[in-house]
Amino acid sequence: KNGGKPVKIAMAFEQDAFSQDVRLGILDAAKRTGSKIIIDDKLPKELNDMAATLSKVKATNPDVLVVSGHTKGALTAVRQISEMKVDVKMLAMTHCDAAALSKQHGKASEYALCASQWHKSLSYTDNFFKDGTTYDADFTKAFGYAPPYQAAESSAALLVFKDAFERAQSFDTKKVRDALAATDMQTFYGNIKFAEGGQNVSKPMVLFQVSCNDDGSKCE
């Protein structure tokens, strides 16, 4: 909500399972907060033009614009928002990190609010990778680029298996599975604890906002 008042929401989503899950979450949040969906658009398959949606945004002035179209959709959205001079109070997106949004579009991407699984600045620690900042530095030194969240979660998965094997004291499938199910630990990536369905219910998503220095030469 905006100062305790319901907000007007515009949204545009790709038609894949992930983006549609995000859409359902927005619909649920709108219902809970009494907010109103004023634009509910499908992104084109090519993800190369969302001018039609942005024209509606300019005409209706929503409080929030939510876009989920993976890497290409994120890049297209920021490019066309800048080109069409769309002024929206809040821009919320997925896949900002995968799109390297701040590097690709610089100042044009400033203030975009991004959902992510992980960020190097989080305070989680472990005894192997230490913390996010250390992991980021070590990964970048080894591979020549900053780690995406997929690399971080894969590294954390190795720690989970290591811990499970040590507790199981066996390679027996059932014993290892039972050990995995009983996992309750912290890694540099976040806390790990599984629900009955196998989902990690202990680590929340994070939000970060793209910010730039005064002249726009550096954004992150």
Task: Enumerate the predicted regions with their spans.
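Phosphate- and divalent-cation-binding pockets in alpha/beta enzyme and binding domains
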Residues: 21, 76, 100-101, 160
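Conserved beta-strand scaffold positions in the cores of enzyme catalytic domains, especially
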Residues: 37-42, 112-114, 207
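Extracellular/periplasmic periplasmic-binding protein-like sensory domains
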Residues: 78-155
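Segments of small-molecule ligand-sensing domains
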Residues: 138-151, 160-219
